[in-house]
């Protein structure tokens, strides 16, 4: 009996200490958050919101409004700060203290990042080297004409749906579009957009984000993390598929590179990575893992987030026919000018009925750019990749302790009335002037923002512009498509289908 009483007392003491630890302010300026229960922390509230069918991004957005834009959350042992207070975000952008990623965050993060490798997850000189090498190579191999060519291929590949009046499901083709571009500039492989292999790659990328979008019990409690492999191998399989695909490309490139390194003209980004990290005859296992992770980071963001943004824009164009026509009028005027220029330059024999939008036309179609940005603001931006603090620091009158896991909550920032008038209203016109007091946050902030942001935006612009040039986009039943946000590592729409109505050729004629 005494032993039982002692055990009960020990448990009570542990629960009390853990409750105090999770809720006590270590500094008078420490951020606040909802009451954290012993052991589980705020997992209780998480499941409560799930029962109410309120997703994670909406739960955090509610807490953000309640706690002045910085919310303390405990998921088991894991302490996280979600930040939407823009003064603190600016501090993150400027202060070197907040540049790093938490390389040993949780098992899921460690697996996805190869223990803090690549571009997205590495730190210090390792990160600078990876980013510099990738950007330098992207400028050479990520040429504008490649994106333009693939956008035309996209338009042509979906023509069969218009001709047969079949329902068109964008997800597979948007992933095929971004995958095809990725494989060309990264591995110098020209694969058609509707290729079955690219469909498999797109599916694997989608599974990576879907299966790894939630923390598991093995992530939340450190004592259980060693058992992650045993119970969650199915979560890791999509990651393995993608990394094996990349490793195969790496091996093929090593075997086919020129014999003289100094005279070698790189064919693609993979060649440039091998030149930077290895040699023709051998490459260390550590560098091989780093190259693989760099490619994995680019693949997952390009095929995942860019393709999802294209899907969101297509969905919103269906739901807003009036705005679709405004954009189409801009495109029509642009094509008319291009057509007249061809004729005036003596190109009367040229096929002026088959002109397409190019990147040089972006300034002539401002409403489409605004529409894309507004779609990203309202629908596709959740929160950032995690940051960490190297040491204690006061930021905008809040105490950020050393080793904190920090997520910038873009979803809440974009719904803040201080920055966006009527923030829940879909209004692309807000991006047509300089009235928004904060910079674009769609691709992250500062030095740790997305290194390929301009290429990503070009892909979305050209894919949508040339699709609207050739087709009117409509819902299947004439009703609005459900645009409820599905939570993942990024915010995505439910799978949906649309109808493509071919536009009359008079659309581009005088």
From Swiss-Prot:
* Coiled-coil features, chain-numbered ranges: none
Cofactor(s) recorded for this entry are: heme
Tell me the InterPro entries matching this sequence. Answer: Cyt_P450, Cyt_P450_CS, Cyt_P450_E_grp-I, Cyt_P450_sf
Name the top EC class: oxidoreductase
State where it is primarily located.
membrane
Entry keywords, A to Z: Heme, Iron, Membrane, Metal-binding, Monooxygenase, Oxidoreductase, Transmembrane, Transmembrane helix
Protein name in UniProt: Probable cytochrome P450 517A2
Q: What gene name is listed for this protein?
A: cyp517A2
């Amino acid at each position: 009996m005494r032993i039982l009483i002692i055990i009960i007392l020990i448990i009570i003491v542990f629960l009390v200490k853990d409750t105090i630890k999770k809720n006590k302010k270590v500094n008078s300026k420490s951020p606040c958050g909802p009451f954290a229960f012993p052991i589980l922390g705020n997992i209780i509230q998480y499941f409560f919101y799930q029962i109410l069918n309120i997703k994670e991004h909406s739960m955090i957005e509610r807490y953000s409004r309640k706690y002045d834009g910085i919310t303390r959350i405990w998921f088991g042992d894991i302490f996280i700060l979600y930040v939407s207070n823009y003064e603190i975000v600016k501090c993150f952008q400027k202060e070197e203290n907040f540049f790093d990623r938490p390389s040993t965050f949780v098992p899921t993060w460690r697996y996805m990042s190869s223990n803090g490798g690549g571009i997205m997850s590495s730190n210090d000189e390792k990160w600078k080297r990876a980013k510099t090498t990738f950007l330098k190579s992207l400028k050479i191999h990520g040429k504008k004409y490649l994106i333009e060519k693939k956008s035309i291929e996209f338009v042509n590949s979906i023509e069969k749906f218009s001709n047969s009046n079949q329902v068109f499901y964008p997800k597979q083709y948007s992933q095929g579009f971004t995958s095809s571009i990725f494989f060309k500039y990264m591995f110098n492989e020209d694969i058609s957009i509707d290729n079955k292999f690219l469909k498999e790659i797109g599916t694997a990328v989608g599974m990576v984000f879907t299966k790894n979008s939630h923390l598991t019990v093995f992530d939340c409690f450190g004592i259980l993390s060693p058992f992650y492999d045993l119970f969650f191998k199915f979560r890791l399989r999509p990651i393995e598929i993608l990394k094996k695909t990349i490793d195969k490309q790496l091996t093929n490139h090593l075997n086919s590179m020129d014999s003289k390194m100094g005279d070698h003209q790189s064919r693609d980004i993979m060649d440039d990575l091998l030149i930077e990290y290895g040699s023709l005859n051998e490459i260390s296992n550590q560098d091989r893992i780093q190259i693989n992770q760099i490619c994995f980071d680019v693949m997952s963001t390009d095929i995942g987030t860019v393709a999802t943004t294209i899907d969101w824009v297509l969905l919103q164009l269906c739901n807003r026919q009036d705005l679709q026509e405004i954009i189409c009028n801009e495109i029509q005027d642009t094509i008319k000018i291009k057509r007249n220029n061809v004729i005036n330059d003596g190109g009367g024999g040229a096929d002026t009925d088959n002109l397409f939008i190019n990147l040089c036309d972006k300034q002539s179609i401002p409403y489409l750019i605004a529409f894309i940005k507004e779609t990203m603001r309202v629908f596709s931006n959740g929160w950032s990749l995690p940051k960490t603090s190297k040491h204690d620091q006061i930021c905008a009158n809040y105490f950020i302790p050393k080793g904190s896991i920090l997520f910038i909550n873009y979803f809440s920032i974009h719904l803040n009335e201080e920055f966006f008038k009527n923030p829940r209203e879909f209004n692309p016109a807000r991006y047509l002037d300089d009235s928004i007091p904060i910079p674009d946050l769609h691709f992250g902030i500062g030095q740790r923002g997305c290194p390929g942001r301009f290429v990503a935006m070009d892909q979305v612009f050209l894919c949508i512009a040339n699709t609207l040039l050739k087709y009117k986009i409509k819902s299947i039943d004439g009703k609005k498509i459900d645009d409820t946000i599905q939570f993942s590592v990024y915010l995505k729409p439910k799978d949906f289908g649309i109808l493509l109505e071919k536009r009359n050729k008079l659309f581009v004629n005088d």
